[in-house]
Regions:
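Rossmann-like NAD(P)H-binding beta-loop-alpha module
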Residues: 42-103
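Rossmann-like dinucleotide-binding domain that binds NAD(P)(H)
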Residues: 93-94, 101-181
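Active-site-proximal cap/loop segments of hydrolase catalytic domains
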Residues: 18, 46, 51, 79, ...
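Short, surface-exposed recognition loops and adjoining beta-strand edges that mediate ligand/DNA contacts
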Residues: 37-38, 42-44, 72-80, 157-172
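Beta-strand-loop-alpha-helix segment that lines the small-molecule cofactor/substrate pocket
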Residues: 1-42, 59
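Stable alpha-helical elements in mature extracytoplasmic
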Residues: 1, 17, 50, 96-99, ...
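Structural recognition of the beta-strand scaffold that forms the well-ordered cores
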Residues: 6-7, 12-13, 31-34, 67-71, ...
Length: 181
């Protein structure tokens, strides 16, 4: 379409999908922006302070390097119901006011169930990916920015989580990102 893109998170569900987006943007000479709206505020989500003094402190080297940053996604208990899917959902009739095929978009077709579609859609791999892809970036993006890692990626990612269901997202206990430096 020859247009620049302003994309809301999550950009893609897989690294491969993300690489294809980058390739298409480069091939077409377009501008692409993945929105994380806290970048346009004085304070980032969960920091409790303005960004620039903290960025200046880190950039000064006074804290040394490498830094270890620990973030926690401690939120209200009810949010966890939105982030965790259920396996073995029974098919239900599609409500008359819902165009289910339109709602699914490019996601694989699965029988309708209210838990899969409405507020709790975040708990299913086909549509979101749970708390990590829904709210995780709000915690991780400030760290990427503050550490000057916007143009790089971790070289190692370690996950402590129970085995995940192929369809329904489960709990993530701990994720460790290691960068080259």
């Amino acid at each position: 379409a020859g247009k620049d893109i302003w994309c809301e998170k999550p950009m893609t569900r897989t690294i491969g999908e993300g690489k294809r987006v980058v390739e298409a943007v480069r091939q077409n000479g377009r501008i692409f922006r993945l929105n994380t709206w806290f970048r346009f505020k004085d304070t980032f989500y969960g920091l409790g302070t303005t960004v620039e003094p903290l960025k200046k402190l880190i950039d000064s080297g006074l804290l040394g390097w490498p830094l270890k940053v620990t973030i926690s996604g401690a939120t209200g208990f009810t949010w966890k119901f939105f982030w965790i899917g259920r396996d073995h959902l029974d098919p239900e009739p599609v409500p008359a006011e819902l165009d289910y095929d339109m709602w699914l978009g490019p996601a694989p077709w699965k029988p309708y169930n209210a838990h899969r579609v409405h507020q709790t859609f975040r708990g299913y791999w086909d549509y979101d990916g749970g708390g990590l892809t829904d709210m995780g970036q709000h915690y991780m993006d400030p760290v990427q920015y503050l550490l000057g890692k916007d143009d790089t990626s971790p070289v190692k990612i370690e996950v402590d989580a129970p085995e995940q269901h192929y369809d329904a997202v489960g709990i993530w206990r701990k994720i460790v990102y290691t960068y080259e430096d």
